């Protein structure tokens, strides 16, 4: 519903701005430019979707091997000690615990097709424990904040888009996204725990969160000792080594399960073509809307206004061109994806803005969409502090993404 209003606003605002430019400034080229943008954007959307097919097939095939090889189950076991303390209101041994573990593990691996059904199942089981059927419980809110914070280990789709948009090194945003999404998730956990008075100062949580924070701090400190060129080389090398290791580990996991790894890959890869075709209308819709908005001059007015505000406050304005992606992400995943593609098209995939838009896309998730789908599936009307905690996690991810990208790029 939110995306519907945003899409309509693109055209109505563009019409108003273009009319003002035509009537008061004598700009007779603005309407031809807007119409040309609709054709160009439609063509771009199709070409992007077509180019995604091969890489999507590759990674969906790899993910299918990992899924069938039990990697999700292994991750769930690793997360178990931490999650039992984040959800103290869930009775020990309740089956919802397994659904939550599996959902978060699937999200971390980027297995959206598996994560969503598992998440909806977890919400149904949490609703069974709910004494006020129209009001969100503490475990529901913590579960949704973990989803909206966008914790991911493998930002496959973003790397795929970067490859299609001509990035020299599509994986160079891998480490920055890992760091930014860590801060987003950490902020979400801390803020929600404060609301719910969950004690994070026990030994397990301190060791886990403290250990992860120490590792992240060490990574940031290590990169801070390098110049930009060296940092880029090391980041790129680490990202590609990790991705290659993930592929090999998934294959070994499949072999350990006596899986026909090749057939599993083919099964997953078939979904690549279907997925690429399925996103064509969504990409056409959002890219045409953004194209008209930009061609009318409205996007430049928005960005220039934010730049003026930031510069007035004495800040660096390099990040402003990527902000539309960050602002759109809590509202709509496809809208934010369109903004990310538009940023790479306008500024270049290897520009600071293009890279930052990708990190924005990977550091958080679609907060309002997730809340609507998950709460709507079980009839929750009163969401309590869920929106506040989700948006604070998003804000932490955006701030972290900006700081990290200034350091890396």
State each model region's role.
Residues 65-76, 89, 102, 106, ...:
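Short amphipathic alpha-helical patches
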Residues 1-54, 163-293, 311-313, 385-409:
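Signature of multi-pass transmembrane helix bundles
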Residues 60, 94-96, 136-139, 240, ...:
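Sparse, context-dependent recognition of short Cys/His-centered cofactor- or disulfide-binding micro-motifs
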Residues 114-115, 122-161, 167-197, 323-409:
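C-terminal transmembrane helix pair
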Residues 101, 105, 140, 231-234, ...:
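Generic signal for short, ordered secondary-structure residues
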Residues 29-128, 257-346:
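Membrane-embedded alpha-helical segments and adjacent helix-loop junctions characteristic
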Residues 36-39, 46, 95-97, 132-140, ...:
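Hydrophobic alpha-helical segments, principally membrane-spanning helices and signal/leader peptides
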Residues 25-28, 93-97, 134-137, 227, ...:
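Short, structured coil/loop segments at alpha-helix boundaries
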């Amino acid at each position: 519903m939110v995306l519907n209003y945003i899409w309509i606003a693109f055209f109505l605002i563009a019409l108003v701005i273009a009319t003002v430019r035509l009537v008061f400034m004598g700009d007779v080229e603005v309407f031809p430019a807007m119409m040309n943008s609709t054709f160009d954007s439609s063509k771009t959307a199709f070409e992007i979707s077509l180019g995604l097919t091969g890489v999507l097939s590759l990674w969906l095939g790899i993910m299918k091997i990992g899924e069938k090889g039990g990697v999700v189950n292994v991750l769930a076991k690793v997360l178990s000690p931490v999650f039992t303390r984040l959800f103290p209101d869930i009775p020990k041994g309740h089956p919802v615990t397994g659904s939550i573990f599996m959902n978060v593990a699937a999200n971390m691996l980027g297995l959206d097709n598996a994560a969503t059904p598992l998440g909806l199942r977890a919400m149904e089981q949490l609703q069974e424990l709910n004494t006020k059927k129209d009001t969100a419980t503490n475990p529901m809110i913590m579960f949704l904040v973990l989803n909206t914070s966008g914790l991911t280990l493998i930002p496959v789709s973003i790397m795929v888009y970067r490859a299609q948009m001509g990035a020299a090194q599509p994986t160079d945003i891998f480490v920055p996204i890992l760091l930014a999404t860590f801060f987003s998730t950490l902020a979400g956990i801390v803020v929600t725990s404060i609301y719910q008075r969950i004690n994070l100062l026990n030994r397990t949580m301190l060791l886990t969160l403290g250990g992860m924070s120490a590792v992240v701090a060490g990574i940031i400190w290590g990169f801070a000792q390098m110049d930009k060129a060296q940092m880029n080389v090391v980041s790129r090398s680490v990202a590609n080594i990790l991705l290659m290791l993930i592929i090999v580990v998934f294959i070994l996991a499949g072999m350990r399960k006596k899986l026909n790894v090749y057939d599993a890959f083919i099964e997953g890869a078939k979904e690549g073509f279907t997925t690429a075709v399925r996103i064509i209308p969504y990409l056409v819709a959002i890219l045409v809307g953004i194209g008209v908005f930009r061609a009318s001059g409205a996007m430049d007015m928005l960005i220039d206004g934010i730049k003026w505000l930031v510069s007035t406050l004495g800040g660096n304005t390099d990040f402003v061109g990527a902000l539309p992606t960050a602002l759109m992400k809590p509202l709509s995943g496809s809208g934010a994806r369109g903004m990310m593609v538009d940023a790479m098209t306008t500024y270049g995939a290897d520009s600071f803005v293009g890279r930052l838009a990708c990190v924005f896309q990977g550091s958080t998730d679609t907060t309002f969409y997730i809340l609507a789908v998950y709460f709507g599936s079980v009839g929750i009307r009163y969401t309590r502090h869920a929106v506040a905690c989700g948006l604070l996690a998003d804000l932490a991810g955006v701030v972290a993404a900006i700081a990290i990208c200034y350091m890396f790029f």
